[in-house]
C-alpha cells in the first residue's frame, strides 16, 4: 500500500488565543511542519472581528494573556479590544508564526481519510490541504457545522 505524505503534520484553524497558543507550543516542541489557517486577513480572532464602542475584556488584563508572554503595559485593568488585538499581533510576530499563517483560508470541511490516515481540509477558496492532525482554535463565536445525520431534526 502506498501512503500519501500530508502537506503538514499539523493544521491549526484560527488565529485567536487558542490558535496562536497552539502554534507557539508546536514551535517550542520543535514541530515545524504545521500551518495555521485563518479566514480573515489578520490575526486576532474575536478581538479582530469585534470592534464596537466600549468593546473590552471582562477578565482582568494580567490574566488575559499567555503565561509565557506577560504584558506589563496594559492601560486598564480590563483591556480594550484594540490593545488585545495588538497583543495577539505582537505574539504572532515575536514567536515567528507569520510564515505559517495562511490568510484568507476559511475551512469549510475537515474530512478524515481512513485509508491514508490523514485529514483533508477544504477551504472556501477551493484549496485542499492535508495533515496528520487538526487542531481547532475557531472559538465559541464561530458558526457551527452540524453533521447530516438522518433523524437529527426530529430527535427529542
Which positions does each model-derived feature cover?
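A short, basic/flexible loop-to-alpha-helix module at the beginning of a structural domain
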Residues: 1-8
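N-terminal Rossmann-like FAD-binding beta1-loop-alpha1 element of flavoenzymes
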Residues: 8-36
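Catalytic P-loop NTPase motifs of RecA-like helicase/translocase cores
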Residues: 20, 43-44, 144
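Short amphipathic alpha-helical segments
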Residues: 24-25, 48-49, 146-150
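Glycine-rich FAD pyrophosphate-binding loop
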Residues: 27-52
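Glycine-rich active-site loop/strand segments that organize a redox cofactor
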Residues: 48-90
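Feature captures the FAD/FMN-dependent oxidoreductase FAD-binding
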Residues: 76-142
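Glycine-rich beta-alpha-beta "Rossmann" dinucleotide-binding loop(s) and their flanking helix/strand
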Residues: 134, 138-156
